[in-house]
Amino acid sequence: MKEATDVFNHWAHLGKDEGMERGHANAVNEMIDVAMERVLEGRVAFSAVDLGCGNGWVVRKLSQHPACVEAVGYDGAEHMIEKAKEGDFINTYHCAKFPETKPEKTYQFVHSMEFLYYLKDPKGMLQSIHDDWLEEGGWAVIGIDHYAEHEESLSWPEALEVHMSTFSEAEWIQMWNDVGFQEIHAWRANARDGKPGTLAILGKKA
């Protein structure tokens, strides 16, 4: 099996990151809109981090929000981080190894799209997001396209020769409960035209 970071490094060279951005935009926009209703409740400003940020497109989007005071991106693929830095001189990007990497500070909003299931221990990373990355009272939203109910996605690990951790919607939601998240809300973002959509899960560190 290939390392996921090697696959994404290759895709960055091929320019596939731009296609990923277009393909994920509708789901991500919906996820952020839903999350912001909670993040900005009783708060006039927020800091944000995108884990598995790729070429930085979500970081750039978040930084343009009028209430965002800081937006940071982390990714394990070196060439993705290079592309992010080349296209953005304002925000900060880090090449990181997960789940080992821990932040120097906590954030009020954590976003992640198509990242968690590439890890062999996604629950451990989710625990770290809750314990290490989020400020108390902060919110996390995570998008997952590879899950048991999305039957088309079940062939992806073999097709890409990359490890993917496969769980059902209920199992993913239970992980959020297990690691301590509260006010958990799960839905399928951008579900249309007979497609199951992105499993989006939102939760708060209380």
Residue ranges and their predicted role:
Residues 1-40, 148-149:
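Conserved class I S-adenosyl-L-methionine
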Residues 49-51, 55-100:
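Class I SAM-dependent methyltransferase SAM/SAH-binding core
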Residues 111:
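A conserved beta-strand element that flanks and buttresses the S-adenosyl-L-methionine
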Residues 123-136:
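A short glycine-rich, Lys/Arg-flanked "PGG" loop and its adjoining helix->strand segment in the class I
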Residues 137-145:
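Conserved beta-strand signature within the Rossmann-like core of class I S-adenosyl-L-methionine
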Residues 145-163:
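Short, glycine-/aromatic-enriched active-site segment of Class I SAM-dependent methyltransferases
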Residues 164-179:
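Short alpha-helix
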Residues 188-206:
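Core SAM-dependent methyltransferase catalytic element
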